[in-house]
From Swiss-Prot:
Residues 287-297 have a biased composition (Polar residues). One of its GO terms (biological process) is regulation of cell cycle phase transition. It comes from Dictyostelium discoideum (Social amoeba). The keyword Transmembrane helix does not apply. GO terms for molecular function: ATP binding; cyclin-dependent protein serine/threonine kinase activity; protein serine kinase activity. Residues 643-655 have a biased composition (Pro residues). Residues 243-299, 409-444, 483-507, 597-680 are annotated as: Disordered. Keywords: ATP-binding, Kinase, Nucleotide-binding, Serine/threonine-protein kinase, Transferase. Its EC number is 2.7.11.22. It comes from the Eukaryota. Belongs to the protein kinase superfamily. CMGC Ser/Thr protein kinase family. CDC2/CDKX subfamily. Transmembrane segments: none annotated. Residues 257-286, 410-444, 483-494, 597-616, 632-642, 656-680 have a biased composition (Low complexity). This is Putative cyclin-dependent serine/threonine-protein kinase DDB_G0272797/DDB_G0274007.
Length: 680
């Protein structure tokens, strides 16, 4: 509200008020509508919902914005400002609408109604005050507070307390809760007649008076003229109460006549007069016998409408208004409606197109009522001769109209007389041909018997078919059960086989893991042995070094001994080379065997998996480790070291046992004197 300045108040309604305002930034005029009773549908205000659906249409008012004030208790709608409306124009005594203006406004009104109905929306409150007219003569529909959506002949219950009373159709006045967009077309017809006559078409003080005016003009509806009217709650309540009142009056008059006959035996003339008067009263009371008494129970959601019978006019059911007691087609009903309108408004004789369109929109039966698309295609909107013609209201015109009405009534009387003659001829023919009726009855009975026989045969056939279908269904069920059992058995066997293969595979993996652990243990043992051998070799080299030192100090080896030692060393080297070659060959063989084992131990599919324990190659591995020890043994080189003369040097053996060095006794004897000499 801070962006708008309120200039003046335009109007006040049941659910809020409308103000004229101006936008502070754009300086454009707007209409601000304050709504206190906010009706919502699908979590959104009704008027906002449907105005957004009908946005930017030519004959619908444009909604610019909306917001809440006073703690969301008041809804404010910002719409385009249009100062004039149709009610202000018609209520001005100095303003007289031409026939061209009436046609223009009616066409624009039908365009707006069509835009609503095409989008699945019923306005439910069409009246002149809700038809805004711009300075350019554009008519726009406004006030969608009572609008609702509908499906094609929706079966949901709706409120019957909608549409302003003067423009409310008869089905809503009779309490119907199932209706469609045809209720808007009745309102358009009332507005058209109001513009033509410059006065309200039906201006009842309440719902009862409104029904009275409608039925006075168009006659009392029956099941023949309006199928389904007797099921409306207001219809039953209306006519049943009237019949009860007439029966009570008849009973009272009969009792009164009996008392007069018993008490006034001497006054025969008076009694005869009283009886004649009572008979006349009874004849007058019989005018309600033409009203249909059949009724259906009304829906529980629609409240009954009461109080019609007590306030309807006395000539409500007179013969003058009972024009629908016979069976008529849609064209006959339109002709009767046109006649009734001409009787009340004689100047419509000179406006046949207007009369035709109005009678099609003001049909009592809503299913026979014209829709907005059909109304826009009416010939009245295609002609342009009456654009500037003023609606006639002169006395000469009324005389001409009365003459036309008298001539039409004479024609109707002649037609009625002709129909009576035809009925009499038909009755005579029926009396002359009693035998034909009997034959027809017999044929009818035979046809009924044949139909019964055919029904029995059809029933027997259906029973046989059902029995056959049951047997077929049972067989199919049995086959399905067998298939299911077979599938279960196959699945169980497959699962068992798969489990067995899985267990075998797990066992094989466990065995492989155990073998790998054993191999690791063997490798660790071999490593330990290799370490021990290396230690022994180191000790051996230390002893040899000590021994050579002793030899260098106390002896000079001979050349022959040196040559022998060299030969021995060469032989040892040759032996070591041969051993290395053998070890390489054994390693190659072991690698080939390991590759073969890996190929054999690869995982195969469960269906063709055959477990074969691997071949243990413990001996070959042991040999391989033993050869590996020989490869890593260091070879002593004694080319430039002195050798002892009497004894050969001890050589390292390729066994796993540790070697020990022995010193010859000659060396010990030589060492001792030297020590003693040095001591001395």
């Amino acid at each position: 509200m801070e962006d708008y300045i309120i200039l003046s108040k335009c109007g006040q309604g049941t659910y809020g008020s409308v103000f004229k305002g101006i936008h502070k930034i754009t300086h454009s005029l707007v209409a601000l509508k304050r709504v206190t009773d906010i009706a919502q549908e699908d979590g959104e205000p009704v008027e906002v919902k449907y105005l957004n659906q009908l946005k930017n249409l030519s004959n619908i008012v444009n909604l610019r914005d909306h917001f809440y004030i006073d703690k969301n208790s008041v809804l404010v709608l910002i719409m385009e400002f249009i100062e004039g409306d149709l009610w202000k124009i018609m209520s001005n005594p100095q303003c007289t609408l031409s026939l061209g203006q009436i046609k223009n406004f009616t066409k624009q009104l039908l365009e707006g109604v069509k835009q609503c109905h095409v989008n699945g929306i019923m306005h439910r409150d069409i009246k002149p005050a809700n038809l805004l007219i711009t300075t350019n003569g554009v008519l726009k529909l406004t006030d969608f507070g009572l609008s609702t959506s509908y499906s094609k002949r929706s079966e949901k219950f709706l409120s019957s307390n909608v549409v302003s009373l003067y423009y409310r159709p008869p089905e809503l006045l009779l309490g119907s809760c199932i209706y469609g967009p045809e209720i808007d077309m009745w309102s358009v017809g009332c507005i058209l007649m109001e513009m033509i006559n410059n006065s309200y078409l039906f201006a009842g003080a309440d719902e009862t008076a409104q029904l009275d005016l409608i039925f006075k003009l168009f006659g009392c509806p029956t099941e023949k003229s309006w199928p389904g009217v007797s099921s409306l709650p207001g219809y039953n309540d209306l006519f049943n109460k009237q019949q009860q009142q007439q029966q009570n009056e008849n009973n009272y008059s009969k009792q009164h006549n009996n008392n007069n006959n018993n008490n006034n035996n001497n006054n025969n003339n008076n009694n005869n007069n009283n009886n004649n008067n009572n008979n006349n009263n009874n004849n007058n009371n019989n005018k309600y016998n033409n009203i249909s008494t059949s009724c259906l129970q009304s829906p529980s959601s629609s409240p009954p409408i009461g109080g019609y019978a007590s306030s309807l006019s006395s000539d409500f059911n007179s013969n003058e208004y009972n024009g629908y007691n016979q069976t008529f087609s849609n064209e006959d009903c339109l002709a009767i409606s046109q006649k009734k309108l001409i009787d009340k408004f004689p100047h419509l004789v000179l406006l046949p197109s207007v009369l035709d369109l109005a009678s099609k929109m003001l049909t009592l039966d809503p299913k026979k009522r014209i829709n907005s698309l059909e109304a826009l295609e009416h010939p009245w909107f295609k002609s342009s001769n009456d654009m500037d013609q003023i609606v006639p209201f002169s006395k000469d015109f009324t005389d001409l109209a009365n003459r036309y009405i008298a001539s039409t009534r004479q024609l109707q009387q002649q037609q009625h007389h002709h129909q009576q003659q035809q009925q009499q001829q038909q009755q005579q023919q029926q009396q002359q041909q009693p035998h034909q009726q009997q034959l027809i009855q017999r044929q009818h009975q035979e046809q009924q018997q044949q139909q019964l026989i055919q029904r029995q045969q059809e029933q027997s056939k259906q029973q046989l078919i059902q029995h056959h279908q049951q047997s077929v269904n049972q067989q199919q069920l049995a086959q399905q059960q067998q298939l299911a059992q077979h599938q279960q058995y196959n699945s169980q066997q497959h699962q068992q086989h798969h489990q067995q293969q899985h267990q075998q595979h797990q066992q094989h993996q466990q065995q492989q893991q155990q073998q790998q652990q054993q191999q690791q243990q063997q490798q660790q043992q071999q490593q330990q042995q290799q370490q021990q051998q290396q230690q022994q070799q180191q000790q051996y080299h230390q002893h040899q070094q000590q021994y050579h030192q002793y030899q260098q100090q106390y002896h000079q080896p001979s050349q022959q001994q040196q040559q022998q030692q060299q030969q021995q060393q060469q032989q040892q080297q040759q032996q070591q080379q041969q051993q290395q070659q053998q070890q390489q060959q054994q390693q190659q063989q072991q690698q080939q065997q390991q590759q073969q084992q890996q190929q054999q131990h690869q995982y195969q599919p469960p269906q063709q998996y055959n477990h074969q324990p691997p071949q243990h190659q413990h001996q070959h591995q042991h040999q391989h480790q033993h050869q590996h020890q020989h490869q890593h043994q260091p070879q002593p080189q004694h080319q430039h070291q002195p050798q002892p003369q009497p004894q050969p040097t001890p050589t390292p053996t390729p066994t796993s046992t540790p070697t020990t060095t022995t010193i010859p006794p000659t060396i010990t004897t030589t060492i001792q004197p030297t020590i003693s000499k040095s001591n001395g």
